[in-house]
Amino acid sequence: MSKTHLTEQKFSDFALHAKVIEALENKGFHYCTPIQALALPLTLAGRDVAGQAQTGTGKTMAFLTSAFHYLLSNPAMADRKVNQPRALIMAPTRELAVQIHADAEPLAQTTGLKLGLAYGGDGYDKQLKVLESGVDILIGTTGRLIDYAKQNHINLGAIQVVVLDEADRMYDLGFIKDIRWLFRRMPPTPQRLNMLFSATLSYRVRELAFEQMNNAEYVEVEPEQKTGHRIKEELFYPSNEEKMRLLQTLIEEEWPDRAIIFANTKHRCEDIWGHLAADGHRVGLLTGDVAQKKRLRILEDFTRGDLDILVATDVAARGLHIPAVTHVFNYDLPDDCEDYVHRIGRTGRAGASGHSISLACEEYALNLTAIETYIGHSVPQSKYNPDALLSELPPPKRLTRARSGNGPRRTGAPRNRRRPG
């Protein structure tokens, strides 16, 4: 983490369990981020917390540190059974659940607490095998958790810690009934440590906190501006006919180390992927139609640097921490103002700088006024020369098979591309 992203508060200054401190120091975590510095004194005192912070500022480690400390410092129920986890962490998407599990593994290795993972799409029997051996901390999506609970593969009667991550997204995706179903099968609220984290603490999220938490303390870390001051924002007004050529020209000119391109529909994403893959870019596609195993592999390839560009719908816009994203392209301006903030928040994280480029085409330009009102400033406009756009581009590839991942590898230097004139 960048030092500009940290506070002067050390983890070692808190009365954290020694094994938790050891795990944090092994990972190089010595100083707290602002949300960690605010949340930990409360959770260590046994207080419930509803936290708001800009994405990428350490929310996950705040609740993981709290959960591991609590379980190590408080004994399990005397009659706890093997199918009863002690902590439950709920996430809105499979990708976020997998990421939280990965972040928790170093803590689990040091402390000896066992992790379980439960998400839909695939891996039912593999996940179940882990659960049947007994887990302390279960991380998952609500649908698969309910499935296991209804079949008595898990029992929530011994839960001591509950975490609800990206609570606003849970509402957006219609999971609130599932959340309440799971809460009703846990011990009473005062008998648990309850944590809720969200990019926004809207009225409905606060209502959920009031309903399911024990006099939760609200902690908020407000950014200087909603879009983050380290993100350079830029806006172009292309015609529909020039939009794809402008995107490809900007990619050639910027030559980003790692970029995410967002579009509003899966069909638009597939079209963008096809053009970039045909043009020789190392590009992956992430939409709801991509099989779960392939989604995880694409994310791993992108994080590892085997892919330079990821084309995605908003399924990837919330919660995922992919380090070192240098550029975000809004091929379509989103219909939801918050999605603009979450999209461009994939770059400029943890003290790094980033570049966001948005294309306000004829179809989605009307969304700009609401977006600028929401973020509190105008997005700087840039102009382009239509005659300087790339030409003679190859026809796009089509998804004629069940593949949706990697295009051909591109070489390390920009190719010469003919331009008119």
From Swiss-Prot:
Region of interest (Disordered), residue spans: 386-421
Motif DEAD box: chain residues: 165-168
InterPro entries associated with the record: DEAD/DEAH_box_helicase_dom, DEAD_box_RNA_helicase, Helicase_ATP-bd, Helicase_C-like, P-loop_NTPase, RNA-helicase_DEAD-box_CS, RNA_helicase_ATP-dep_RhlB, RNA_helicase_DEAD_Q_motif
Gene3D superfamilies tied to this protein: P-loop containing nucleotide triphosphate hydrolases
PANTHER family for the chain: ATP-DEPENDENT RNA HELICASE RHLB (PTHR47959:SF10), ATP-DEPENDENT RNA HELICASE RHLE-RELATED (PTHR47959)
Family statement drawn from the similarity comment of this UniProt entry: Belongs to the DEAD box helicase family. RhlB subfamily.
Name of the molecule in the record: ATP-dependent RNA helicase RhlB
Encoding gene per record: rhlB
